[in-house]
Amino acid sequence: MSMQDPIADMLTRIRNGQAANKVAVTMPSSKLKVAIANVLKEEGFIEDFKIEGGTKPVLELVLKYFQGNAVVESIQRISRPGLRIYKKKDELPKVMAGLGIAVVSTSKGVMTDRAARQAGLGGEIICYVA
């Protein structure tokens, strides 16, 4: 059976892994998932990630905790296959008044809402992370 929304699956694996205090979570890899993982690492929401190759590459995310609590308080899918959400550069949302991030897919790649605003780019709002 094929997966309908692989990005939602990725976010759910992160959410469930942190709820169960797992060190790392694994999932099938794709270019978009790697780009999202890179943004999460740059923003300090995950420790690290690596791709274990082969014919079916696997993405492993090393989860991050602070004083025993998960760093990711909430992670929420916004644009989904049945309802895509696009925003212009001046309409990009501020998550938790700037404390969280919105992951945005732009014409220049996947980046945070802050980076997209600085670059003057709009795009598809993939998810909110706080």
UniProtKB/Swiss-Prot annotation:
Sorted alphabetically, which keywords does the UniProt record give? Ribonucleoprotein, Ribosomal protein, RNA-binding, rRNA-binding
What family does the entry list? Answer: Belongs to the universal ribosomal protein uS8 family.
Pfam families in the record:
Ribosomal_S8 (PF00410)
How the protein assembles, per its UniProt entry?
Part of the 30S ribosomal subunit. Contacts proteins S5 and S12.
Q: What is this protein called?
A: Small ribosomal subunit protein uS8
* Role this protein plays: One of the primary rRNA binding proteins, it binds directly to 16S rRNA central domain where it helps coordinate assembly of the platform of the 30S subunit.
Which N-terminal stretch is annotated as signal sequence?
none
Extract the GO molecular function terms from the UniProt entry. rRNA binding; structural constituent of ribosome
Q: Which GO terms describe its cellular component?
A: ribonucleoprotein complex; ribosome
Q: Which Gene Ontology BP terms does the record give?
A: translation
Organism, scientific name: Buchnera aphidicola subsp. Acyrthosiphon kondoi (Acyrthosiphon kondoi symbiotic bacterium)
